[in-house]
Swiss-Prot record:
Residues 81-176 form the Toprim domain. Keywords: DNA damage, DNA recombination, DNA repair, Metal-binding, Zinc, Zinc-finger. The lineage of its organism: Bacteria, Pseudomonadati, Pseudomonadota, Gammaproteobacteria, Alteromonadales. Pfam families: RecR_C (PF21175), RecR_HhH (PF21176), Toprim_4 (PF13662). May play a role in DNA repair. It seems to be involved in an RecBC-independent recombinational process of DNA repair. It may act with RecF and RecO. CDD domains: TOPRIM_recR. The gene is recR. InterPro entries: DNA_Rcmb_RecR (IPR000093), Rcmb_RecR (IPR023627), Rcmb_RecR_Znf (IPR015967), TOPRIM_dom (IPR006171), TOPRIM_RecR (IPR034137). Belongs to the RecR family. This is Recombination protein RecR. GO terms for biological process: DNA recombination; DNA repair. It comes from Pseudoalteromonas translucida (strain TAC 125). It comes from the Bacteria.
Length: 202
């Protein structure tokens, strides 16, 4: 069966999503055309609107539809003096959902990866350095992912913090709540042991 040009284009477009291969893209395309054309139209309209309307906060670089996001506009957060550095806007959402962090963010939109041609400027570290050079930030929380690239990025930023005499801390890594030791990888166990805390009595 020879697929039409429009259907082929739709399948190819769906493949741009991470984790979606040729078969999955074909399955989604056929489902939308067979059973959910209204949903497909809504998806197309939402994608078009989002691609046009959603940009980046000029201060923290997360997604927003204004020049600055609500977090950066918060006077209370501005006065906290704390800046949390993350790799992605999805990390901001995850941290915000805990309701425990009340500082500002800086979103890298990636991590250092020289082999892929991603250096400091590609992830906005020149912009971050400008922020550190200005007064107002007392602590930077390094919340990059616990990968080789994430650790390298955190180390680079920690050096920038030291240069401008700004405190830097790394989020703890260890055993997840409800996890079992025999199912945890060696690197995670190593972090858990090195980040252990004393047990005190109340």
């Amino acid at each position: 069966m020879q697929l039409s040009a429009s259907l082929t284009q739709l399948i190819e477009a769906l493949r741009c999503q991470p984790g979606i291969g040729p078969k999955s893209a074909q399955r989604i395309a056929f489902h939308l055309l067979e059973r959910d054309r209204k949903g497909g139209t809504q998806l197309g309209n939402a994608l078009t609107k989002a691609m046009t309307a959603v940009g980046h906060c000029e201060s923290c670089r997360t997604f927003c539809e204004q020049s600055q996001c609500d977090i950066c506009l918060s006077t209370k957060r501005q006065d906290s003096g704390i800046l949390c550095v993350v790799e992605s806007p999805s990390d901001v959402l995850a941290i915000e959902q805990t309701g425990q962090y009340l500082g500002l963010y800086f979103v890298l939109m990636g991590h250092l990866s020289p082999i892929d041609g991603i250096g400091p400027k590609e992830i906005g570290l020149d912009v971050l350095e400008t922020k550190l050079a200005q007064s107002g930030i007392s602590e930077v929380i390094l919340a990059t992912n616990p990968t080789v690239e994430g650790e390298t990025t955190a180390h680079y930023i920690a050096q920038l913090c030291h240069k401008y005499k700004v405190g830097a801390s790394r989020i703890a890594h260890g055993i997840p709540v409800g996890g079992e030791l025999d199912l945890v990888d060696g690197t995670t166990l190593m972090h858990a042991f090195s980040g252990r805390r004393a047990v005190t009595q109340d």
